[in-house]
Design a protein with these regions (language model features):
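N-terminal loops that bind phosphate or other acidic moieties
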Residues: 1-151, 155, 161, 165-434
């Protein structure tokens, strides 16, 4: 389909390459969805909220209570992503995977969707069903993952009932209650979570993406809320890329000089502790995630994996979102299996591809480690707006760029349709004229 899309782009009535990255985006969208000009006008953002125990080390200027407050404010469209998504007609699926402070029971829902009608198709077996093996039905690594982990990445886990029916959208004003527990542990002193908890969070994100697909959304974004999560993100980024932690520590929501030095020390110390604990398991991304991540990041990673399983284009927001995307990419790559060693990490079978092939980077974050993460994914952000808010706030703007790319593919005439002789472009097409 990508070849067909590229061929049509070459036939559109314009100088070759004159629409720049819109042309590349339209071809990539066609490859993801299997449609030349899919309907991507219905969009939603999955926002994962959780607190981080490392906050107690003084790595953030904001109190932990902000996580709860903003999670509630998402439902009222009073946050940055709330206002932007409201303006662009984008829905929010707000999920509590580990908020510390109690949220009123009346705001919670066990089923985020309004369920009526027939379900859209979405992979329900292993991700291998779409040619992208992560973990097969038999594929629990020896001595490692819990049994539930088979279903987590395959979308068939014990809690995978959500989205069994399709509907008209997510419930407005509600928070999906998938709280694993109130906040992670302090990664400076101990592992953030158990691997079982990491898998539950990944499963939640997978289910979120699958639910949104079944509800008829044509494109999704991934956002977050969790005070202290630039610290956890930086630790994961350092481990996944090998870049020294001190070189990629940023100031997050803002820090004094003393606070910044403290944050660098905490990130470096947390990485040293985790590396000692992990030993030869440092190559296992789920083990690394459990040591240094957060419930929010784990759930976001699951959403990226779920989007790929459903052939659903997914947009990355800023720094935390791009590190979660890299986490998903590492998990996906590590757990690809060979046909002769089911369940064991090995050489990828089949054609070369990456989970990042399903992703779009929305905007360049000013957070220090962003460029390292996005380059590791092989992606290029669409927008340079000086943004560094998070929440998923870059996604609604990027959605419109992607919509525009699809509109060009769908509505623009070819030279033949426009009755224009394009012979004058022959020399330009052969040479380096731009």
């Amino acid at each position: 389909m990508m070849e067909k899309a590229a061929a049509r782009q070459a036939e559109l009535a314009k100088p070759p390459g004159s629409l720049g990255r819109l042309e590349d985006i339209s071809v990539k969208i066609a490859g993801i969805t299997g449609e030349l000009a899919p309907n991507v006008t219905r969009q939603a953002i999955a926002v994962m909220s959780a607190d981080n125990g490392v906050w107690e080390e003084g790595v953030a200027c904001a109190p932990q209570s902000v996580t709860r407050a903003q999670t509630i404010n998402f439902t009222r469209r009073l946050t940055g992503v709330g206002a932007l998504s409201k303006n662009f007609g984008v829905d929010l699926l707000v999920t509590d995977v580990g908020v510390l402070d109690p949220i009123p029971d009346e705001l919670y829902t066990d089923r985020p969707e309004i369920a009526v009608g027939a379900a859209a198709e979405c992979a329900t077996g292993s991700v291998a069903a779409i040619g992208k093996a992560v973990v097969t039905e038999k594929g629990v690594p020896a001595g490692g993952k819990v049994a539930a982990g088979i279903g987590v990445l395959a979308g068939t886990g014990a809690r995978a009932g959500i989205g069994a029916r399709a509907g008209t959208g997510v419930q407005a004003g509600k928070i999906w209650n998938r709280k694993i527990r109130p906040a992670t542990n302090n990664i400076y002193k101990e592992a953030a979570m158990t691997e079982e908890e990491a898998l539950l969070a990944i499963e939640t994100g997978f289910e979120a993406a699958r639910t949104l697909k079944k509800l008829g959304y044509g494109m999704i974004g991934v956002g977050e809320m969790g005070i202290g999560n630039t610290t956890t993100s930086t630790c994961l980024l350092a481990e996944f890329t090998g870049v020294p932690a001190a070189q990629i520590v940023g100031k997050g929501g803002g820090l004094s000089s003393d606070g910044y030095e403290r944050k660098k020390a905490v990130v470096s110390g947390a990485c040293e502790r985790a590396e000692s604990e992990l030993g030869d398991r440092r190559e296992d991304p789920i083990a690394v995630l459990a040591e240094l991540g957060g419930f929010d990041i784990a759930a976001m990673a699951g959403a990226y994996i779920g989007a790929a399983a459903c052939r659903l284009p997914v947009v990355i927001d800023g720094y935390i979102s791009v590190v979660a995307a890299l986490t998903a990419d590492r998990i996906f790559d590590y757990y690809r299996v060979t046909s002769d060693v089911a369940g064991q990490p090995g050489k990828p079978a089949g054609p070369a591809f990456r989970l990042a092939d399903f992703m779009f980077a929305s905007h360049k974050s000013f957070e220090r480690g962003y460029e390292v993460a996005v380059e590791a994914l092989g992606l290029e952000p669409m927008l340079l707006l000086g943004m560094r808010l998070g929440e998923g706030s870059g996604c609604p703007i990027a959605f419109k760029v992607i919509e525009s790319a699809v509109a060009v593919m769908r509505d623009m005439a070819t030279f033949e349709e426009a009755a224009i002789n394009d012979d004058y472009l022959d020399e330009i097409r052969l040479g380096d004229s731009f």
